[in-house]
Structures are given as C-alpha cells and as structure tokens.
Amino acid sequence: MAIQRVLCANDASCEQQSHSLLPDVLVSRRVDLASVIGWALEAKAAGVGHRPIAGQLGVPAATVRGWLRRAAATGGQVAVRLLKVAREADPAGRDPPGGGGIAMLVGTAAAAAQAWSGLSDEPVEVWRFAVAHTAGRLLG
C-alpha cells in the first residue's frame, strides 16, 4: 500500500514539513488493520489474555502484548479525545465508562461511534471511526 504525503502549509503551529495520509483502516506505526487491533482491545476489556487473543487472530503473542501494553498506557488519553468527539455529536451523552485505560478506550470508542451514527442513522464502524478521529493514533 502506498501512503501518500502532503506538504504542510507554512503554519507556525506545525512542526513537520509533511504529513502522511493514512486510510482509516490503519493505525499509525502498525501493520495490522484497525479492526484487528480493535478486536484485540475489546477481548482484553472482556478479560481475555494476550495469548488467547493472539491465537484467535493468528498474530504473534508479542505483537498483541505490545498493542495491549501501549493501549493500557495511553488508552485514557485517547478516550478523552474520543469523548470530546462524542460530545460534539451528542452534548447530552453519557459519562465515559469506568475501568482502566483499555476498558475506557473501548467503551468510549463505541459510545462516540454510536453518537455519530445517531446523527445520520447510518452505521459507523467503531475502529475506523476511532482511527479517523485520533489521526491514526489509536494506540497513542
């Protein structure tokens, strides 16, 4: 897959000269699809360990462990971003789900996608939506 780059306008707030344009099915700096990583996050939030998740996905356990560690460390921050997106769509939306970083990330991603889906009555795929609204930084 060829990743397109665009030149950044002369904006003082921009620290880079160009930016990669990732499709919403890819997570920044990851090879696997957002839906695969999202499934792993959902399974972990449900209490499944990294080895069974890896076996189900056919992905090395070390890869899944890396996703889960990264999500545990940054999930709260990513969830806050997604909560802001959810509130734009539904200001009266519910409070963010409790739990650790991964559980909070999974719950908030689902709530945000559902809130936006309600605006158009069109289905919104949770993990593509989350990737698009975190600029590809689903794992921070």
Q: Which positions does each model-derived feature cover?
A:
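Short, positively charged, Gly/Tyr-enriched micro-motifs
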Residues: 11-99
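Long C-terminal interaction/binding lobes of large macromolecular proteins
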Residues: 77-140
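Cysteine-rich micro-motifs
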Residues: 1-15
